[in-house]
Amino acid sequence: MRLLLDMINWSFYNKSLVRRGEVILDFDVIDSWYSELDSMNDGKRGGQYHYPDSFIQLLGYMRVYFHLPYRQAEGVVIAHAGNKIPSIPNYSTINRRINNQDIRISERHEVGNDDDIIIALDSTGIKVANRGEWIRHKWHVRRGYLKIHVAVNIKNKKIISLEVTSEEVHDGKMLKKLIDNASANNNVKGALADGMYDSNKNFRYLSKNHIKPGIKTRSNSKVKTGNCQARNRSVMRQQTNLKRWKHSVSYGQRWMAETVFSSIKRTFGEYVTARKFQNMAKEMLLKASLYNMFAIGM
């Protein structure tokens, strides 16, 4: 632990944390207010937009970071930008526009357009309400949780694909969708995942797309003729020398996904405040998008 602390560039780390405050309260988006609105309303039928997307997304970031209700978000606008913008959006407008935003968490990665990347897949649970344990004990209400499925670039710890589902959805069923989304903007050449993703279907998908599998197979797995050959090879290699297999696929880097979950929960909390499922998903996308902006300081 002491060695790890000594390796951290504390000056750089501190500056990156300071930068978070600049990102959250960056009202410079106001400078492009009219040009952005002109672009958004060009060719639009019906009612016109009165507030640019970049401004609404900034309010969304402030909400999830500071845990602000919509009315307080309106108050922040009045206090910090009231004399700089033509009109103040009321809390219902902020609510509607934030939950209708197209939130993108993955653009072309900065390392280089042609770089190959390895991703780590995993999921975690997020509470659907922060009501306290006493309610569950007194009223016997099962709070439930969402499942957040992610694909993380192990090189920079950024989320490049995210899906939100109910708790009943099995991790393994999300592999294809996560990688399809990740591959839209990245050259995915390897995928690391635990035994929850172990299936012939997933191995066939990875093989078809020329993605090196780094999936931990079940301990009782057998090599069978009808199985996917890529999975059979992984089973044999893991049963012959598990340590060598882990080294060959960089399996130890799978913990990057767990690090991301830890950072998100520590930064934004372990719950969502929205009540509707689609709004819960939007809230998590906002958190993931903001996490990516913060990632260098995590």
Placement of each model-derived feature along the sequence:
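Polybasic low-complexity intrinsically disordered regions
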Residues: 44-57, 62-71, 75, 86-209, ...
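A residue-level structural signature of the nucleotidyltransferase/glycosyltransferase Rossmann-like core
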Residues: 5, 118, 190, 253-254
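Basic, short loop/linker segments at the boundary and entry of helix-turn-helix/winged-helix-like folds
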Residues: 14-66
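Basic DNA-binding region of bZIP-type proteins
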Residues: 9, 41, 241
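Double-stranded DNA-binding cores of transcription factors and transposases
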Residues: 1-11, 15-16, 54
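Acidic/polar active-site rim loop that often engages polyanionic ligands
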Residues: 78-79
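Basic, amphipathic alpha-helical segments enriched in Lys/Arg and hydrophobic/aromatic residues
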Residues: 53, 61, 242-298
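Helix-centered, glycine/charged polyanion-binding patches within enzymatic domains
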Residues: 1-4, 195-266
